[in-house]
């Protein structure tokens, strides 16, 4: 069994990858953990500790080869693979996700979108993507080898949809519903309102 990596590490790993991408664009060939830390507002020791979960990178006193580290982290994150996704919920969020072109550019291909509203069936949610009946969800996931499910349904239906996705063989879930779901596969919760509350807390705190 693979070593369990703390979730904050995986989130920072994405930040490292994006920072290294910018460094490559700038033509930087070697970078120190101190410079990465400065750019990301972290401690250099934290970066070194995070990377140590995955092996040895760089040389003491020299730094990291930017291209090598970028490729290595990309391999860890699975960026070279094209991931198949389905969206459940063809409301505003579901359609917005389906139309987000950057996802396809980054290796995330939405292959289906589902809803329970008969008035939405057969309508185009995004270019080349029409809404299907949610009753067909499991069959579609199994037949197309879908790996990631995106939940964009009301809170009261999120747990049921998550369980159906898991049973169908989904490997991970991106959850936009404002409720925590409990399944055995990895879940990433995106709660826009909660994030805004954190932001307003910081604003109020700064201005008091």
Swiss-Prot record:
Start-end of DNA-binding region: 15-54
Domain of life according to the entry: Bacteria
List of residues binding NAD(+): 89-94
UniProt entry keywords in alphabetical sequence: Cytoplasm, DNA-binding, NAD, Repressor, Transcription, Transcription regulation
GO cellular component: cytoplasm
UniProt GO molecular function: DNA binding; DNA-binding transcription factor activity
Biological process annotations from GO: negative regulation of DNA-templated transcription; response to redox state
Location in or out of the cell: Cytoplasm
Pfam families found in the cross-reference section: CoA_binding, Put_DNA-bind_N
Assembly: Homodimer.
Recorded family membership: Belongs to the transcriptional regulatory Rex family.
Free-text function comment from the UniProt entry: Modulates transcription in response to changes in cellular NADH/NAD(+) redox state.
Protein name per UniProt: Redox-sensing transcriptional repressor Rex
């Amino acid at each position: 069994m693979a070593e369990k990596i703390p979730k904050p590490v995986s989130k920072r790993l994405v930040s490292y990858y994006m920072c290294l991408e910018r460094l490559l664009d700038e033509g930087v060939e070697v970078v120190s953990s101190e410079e990465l830390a400065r750019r990301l507002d972290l401690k250099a020791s934290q970066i070194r500790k995070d990377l140590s979960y995955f092996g040895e990178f760089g040389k003491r006193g020299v730094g990291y080869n930017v291209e090598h580290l970028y490729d290595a982290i990309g391999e860890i994150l699975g960026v070279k693979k094209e991931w198949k996704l389905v969206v459940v919920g063809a409301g505003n969020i579901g359609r917005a996700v389906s139309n987000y072109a950057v996802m396809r550019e980054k290796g995330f291909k939405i292959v289906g979108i589902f809803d329970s509203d008969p008035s939405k069936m057969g309508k185009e949610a995004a270019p080349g993507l029409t809404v299907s009946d949610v009753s067909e969800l499991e069959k579609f996931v199994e037949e197309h080898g879908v790996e990631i499910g995106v939940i964009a349904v009301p809170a009261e239906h999120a747990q049921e949809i998550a369980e159906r996705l898991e049973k169908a063989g989904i490997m991970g879930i991106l959850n936009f519903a404002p409720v925590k779901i409990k399944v055995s596969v990895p879940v990433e919760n995106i709660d826009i309102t909660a994030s805004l509350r954190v932001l307003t807390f910081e604003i109020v705190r700064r201005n008091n």
